[in-house]
From Swiss-Prot:
ATP binds at residues 4-11, 133-140. This is N-acetyl-D-glucosamine kinase. Pfam families: ROK. The keyword Transcription regulation does not apply. GO terms for molecular function: ATP binding; N-acetylglucosamine kinase activity; zinc ion binding. GO terms for biological process: N-acetylglucosamine metabolic process; peptidoglycan turnover. Its EC number is 2.7.1.59. Keywords: ATP-binding, Carbohydrate metabolism, Kinase, Metal-binding, Nucleotide-binding, Transferase, Zinc. It catalyses: N-acetyl-D-glucosamine + ATP = N-acetyl-D-glucosamine 6-phosphate + ADP + H(+). Belongs to the ROK (NagC/XylR) family. NagK subfamily. It comes from Salmonella schwarzengrund (strain CVM19633).
Length: 303
């Protein structure tokens, strides 16, 4: 059995998957905020419960925001203060007497989608998250590509390309990102960015769902806004896809629920790619809230 943990600032979620990659059981508990020992106990107790329930010693994978293992072997995860700065992988491997694998939660999202029954036919899968921020991951032949700093797939911190300024206007404001840089595409393509663009051009403060509702009602202003957003997304993705050249692009996050993104993006991409390039198949993520647990569990699939 494959045990996958999706750990965030508020909850520790465990999903148990069988050899056919089907979810057999799941359980969630609150994330301890201050005590590292309480945090370790919470994870170990869930593993012990799963071992007893299924009569096996399952493999353990964990998806967690941040950098799963720094140079000194410790976790960096600002949203999980009880475990940040601690040697989480080593400590859990020792306590559970098995190889515990950690990866970034965005990489686990991409891995979950790459192991979808239909998507396993694609060697190179790119996951793109358009949510509170912009992120994602890359999976090659069923294995995540992590890089030395676990930042592979941090697409949101690429800068706006010059073609974006041609589209938006050269007086378009370059916003300061939370990472400290200027002009990161996360500030324009995330759910927050979607709403900010609307306010910038129309001087109206609406949230993304409200704008999308107007678009669905045929509102001309919302329609123009969505067209501009999709053109900007295509411009930025053109650079990324030229570097990565994936077979499949899976889009997740809150904005993936807006069907225009997956249905209208493909027709905009070719003008931003090399003439010989083929745009990837574009699909909406299929596994929702279970994706983090799935991807973490599947860190052990390709041994």
């Amino acid at each position: 059995m494959y045990y996958g943990f999706d750990i965030g600032g508020t909850k520790i979620a465990l999903g148990v998957f069988d050899s056919t990659r089907r979810l057999q059981w799941e359980k969630r508990v609150p994330t301890p905020h201050t005590s590292y020992s309480a945090f370790l106990d919470a994870v170990c107790e869930l593993v012990a419960e799963a071992d007893q329930r299924f009569g096996v010693k399952g493999s353990v994978g964990i998806g967690i925001p941040g950098m799963p293992e720094t140079e000194d072997g410790t976790l960096y995860a600002a949203n999980v203060p009880a475990a940040s700065g601690k040697p989480l992988r080593a400590d859990l491997s020792a306590r559970l007497d098995r190889d515990v694998r950690l990866d970034n939660d965005a990489n686990c999202f991409a891995l979950s989608e790459a192991w979808d029954d239909e998507f396993t036919q694609y060697p190179l899968v790119m996951g793109l998250i358009l949510g509170t921020g912009v992120g994602g991951g890359l999976v090659l032949n069923g294995k995540p590509i992590t890089g030395q700093s676990y930042i592979t797939g941090e697409f949101g911190h690429m800068r706006l390309p010059v073609d974006a300024l041609t589209l938006m206007g050269f007086d378009f404001p370059l916003r300061r990102c939370g990472c400290g840089q200027m002009g990161c595409i996360e500030n324009y393509l995330s759910g927050r960015g979607f709403a900010w663009l609307y306010q910038h051009y129309y001087d109206q403060s609406l949230q993304a769902p409200e704008i999308i509702a107007l678009w669905e009602q045929g509102d001309e202003q919302a329609h123009a806004h969505v067209e501009r957003y999709l053109d900007l997304l295509a411009v930025c993705l053109g650079n990324i896809l030229t570097i990565v050249d994936p077979d499949l692009l899976v889009i997740g996050g809150g904005l993936s629920n807006f069907t225009a993104i997956t249905t209208q993006l493909a027709e905009r991409l070719p003008r931003h790619l090399l003439p010989v390039a083929r745009a990837p198949r574009i699909e909406r993520a299929r596994h929702g809230d279970a994706g983090g647990m799935r991807g973490a569990a599947f860190l052990h699939l390709t041994d």
